[in-house]
Each structure stands twice: as structure tokens, then as C-alpha cells.
Amino acid sequence: MVHFVGAGPGAPDLITRRGAALLQTADCIIYAGSLVNPALLGLAKAGCAIYNSAEMTLEQVLAVMRQMEAEHKTTVRLHTGDPCLYGAIREQMDALDADGIAYDDTPGVSSFCGAAAALNAEYTLPAVSQTVIITRAAGKTPVPEREQIESLAAHGATMVIFLSIGLVNQVQQALLQGAYTVSTPVAVVYKATWPEERIVRCTVGDLAESVHKADITKTALIVVGDFLGTQYD
């Protein structure tokens, strides 16, 4: 049996009770590298085999799962945040389906929820925004043409942008092609809920400059919208 488990956004006490229980009983844990708080690995029982998937190919990960299954042992595949968002779990599940290996999913607290908590913010304010768009900029992973940031930005809704801080100049220009203006508020949240969490508040107009000045190059969310302002009904 393979359990896909969301580790949460960073703080180890934000993993779900179910997720923690699965870690405590697993025979094998395959975790998503530095994106997972190492404190969670301390929940593993004595003798648990622990693998860092950041140092493995997909086929190597699957080989470990198959070996554990052959030995009638349980594996926890520990992903950051909630695996349903940018977790790359579909290809693993398809392979397990092909092999006839049973699996299940335990959700986790996504980093976009952790970012809102860090900001003490509500994404959906009356008469401001009742829609949250979760997206990413096109990089190594392509984005469908209809889902380009400039197209989504036309809605002017609350937007949470994952995996794109290294493309911040491109993101800024795309946002300005939509309904956002240079004065639309933005928050960049680095490593939400981790001890080293940082928040940079700026506007769309000075987004790229602010990020470069703060020297944030990875592991950060860009959240955009008037929900960051002070006015609502």
C-alpha cells in the first residue's frame, strides 16, 4: 500500500493527524527533499527506510514502491503542501494502477493557505473578490495558452501564483496586461510558516524591483489583488 500524504506548508505541526499517524507507522517514507520539514521525518518508527526523492528519478521512486509492495510493506510518499497542487502525483498513481498497487491520498495544508495565514488575510472579501485563481507562469512546465497569466489577469480576481518567483519580471508584465494596475497590492510570501518566513508587500508596479531587492529567488508565492487592501463591504 502506498499513501500519498501532504506534509503541509512547512511548520511540522501543520501536518494533519492522519498524515502524522501514517508517518509513524510507515515502513518506508519517500519525501520531497528540502521542501518537506525534516522534523516530520522524526515521526518515523525505528527501522523505517527513508528516501529523498529530490535525489531520485521517477523510475527510482517507483522501484522503491514496488519493492516495498513485494515485501508487503507500506510506503508514505510525502509531498509538500497538498499533493493535489503541483504535486506531480498523477504519473505516480498511473504507474501504480498499471502495477495493481493500491494507494490512497491524505490531503495537506497548501502553501497558499499558509501564505494567507502569514498575511492574516482573507482571499474572498465581499464586493472585492469572490474568486481565487491559482496558477503559475510558463517555465520548464508549459501552461496552456488559454491559461496564460495575462489572460487570467483580465478577471481582476485574487490570484495566487506558484513556482514563478524566478520569472518575476515576466509575471509583472503579464499582470499589467490584465485588469490589475500599477497600484494593485501584492504580497510575496517566502517559505510560509517556516521559521525563516519573510513577507514583502509591494504593488504590481514595483513587484519585480521589490523581489530583486529582497533577494528572493525561490520557494515563494506571489499573491495579488485588492483583498490586500483595506476596503470591502
Residue ranges and their predicted role:
Residues 1-109, 208-209, 220:
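Class I S-adenosyl-L-methionine
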Residues 2, 60, 71-75, 131, ...:
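A contiguous loop/helix-start segment that scaffolds small-molecule binding in enzyme catalytic cores
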Residues 15-17, 114-116, 171-172:
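Short hydrophobic alpha-helical segments that form membrane-spanning helices or hydrophobic packing faces
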Residues 18-22, 44-47, 92-95, 122, ...:
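Short, solvent-exposed amphipathic alpha-helical segments in soluble enzyme
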Residues 31-33, 79, 136, 163, ...:
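Short beta-strand/turn micro-motifs composed of small residues
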Residues 43-44, 63-64, 116-119, 136-137, ...:
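Short secondary-structure transition/capping segments
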Residues 84-155, 195-202:
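Class I SAM-dependent methyltransferase SAM-binding "motif I" and its flanking Rossmann-like core
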